[in-house]
Structures are given as structure tokens and as C-alpha cells.
Amino acid sequence: FHLNNLLWVWGANGPRDIPGDEAYAYRDFYPGAGYVDILGADVYHMDYEQKDYNELLNLAKGKPIALTECGQLPNSAILDAQPDWVWFLVWTNFIYSNNSKRQVNEVYDRPQTLTHKAP
């Protein structure tokens, strides 16, 4: 296909302590450093566990990590404790249905958050 300049992002469900949940430890399904440029986590239910973040960082071995999907935005305390996320993506309309205007403003107004501002 002659595809060049691609980044391969691996995004896994973040491990959770919810009975019947389908998420498992990241290492169980990680394909390996030779196949992945960026490691990601899908985090819902405000389940931003420090141990899971640390596990992903250890697995990444210096590669970037991202919140490939989230329902609730990580708040400032979480982002201060977990500063290595290179981006976050709020799934579909969850930006409005799962976050208050105050929560959205808190995250998007942080100096560390880059956004596209209209001219």
C-alpha cells in the first residue's frame, strides 16, 4: 500500500475493579514494542488508578502514552499526578453528558492543554 509516516496506537481498556468487566491487565494483550508507537488506555467511570497508569508507563518503556478514550475528563489532580498522558479523547457526546461545564473548563483551561482556538 506504500503507506509512510504512520504511527500505530494500541489502545486497551483500562483495568477496572468492576465485577463482570471485560478489562484485564495491559500486559495480557500488549502486542510488543515492535508493533506499537503509542500505548493508550480507554478509561471510563473516573477509574484513573495510579497503579494502572504506572503499569502502562512501565510497559511503554519511554514510548508516549495516551488516553485513547475516556468518558469523564481527568481532573486537575489526576493530571498533576499522571502528567505523561500526551492526549485525551472524550468519547462521542460524553463531553457533554458525563462532564459539567466547570469540569470541561477546568481541563481545557490548563496551561498544559493544547487546543485549536478559532482565529
Regions found by a protein language model. Give the residues of each.
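Active-site-adjacent loop/helix micro-motif of nuclease/hydrolase catalytic cores
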Residues: 47-54
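Acidic (Asp/Glu)-rich catalytic clusters
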Residues: 28-34, 58-59, 79-83
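Extracellular structured ligand-interaction cores
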Residues: 5, 36, 85
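Aromatic-lined carbohydrate-recognition surfaces of secreted/lumenal glycan-active proteins
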Residues: 1-24, 62-73
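Active-site beta-loop-alpha junctions enriched in small/polar residues
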Residues: 11-15, 41-46, 70-73, 90-95
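Substrate-binding cleft of secreted/luminal carbohydrate-active enzymes
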Residues: 63-119
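Aromatic- and acid-rich polysaccharide-binding/catalytic face
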Residues: 26-47, 91
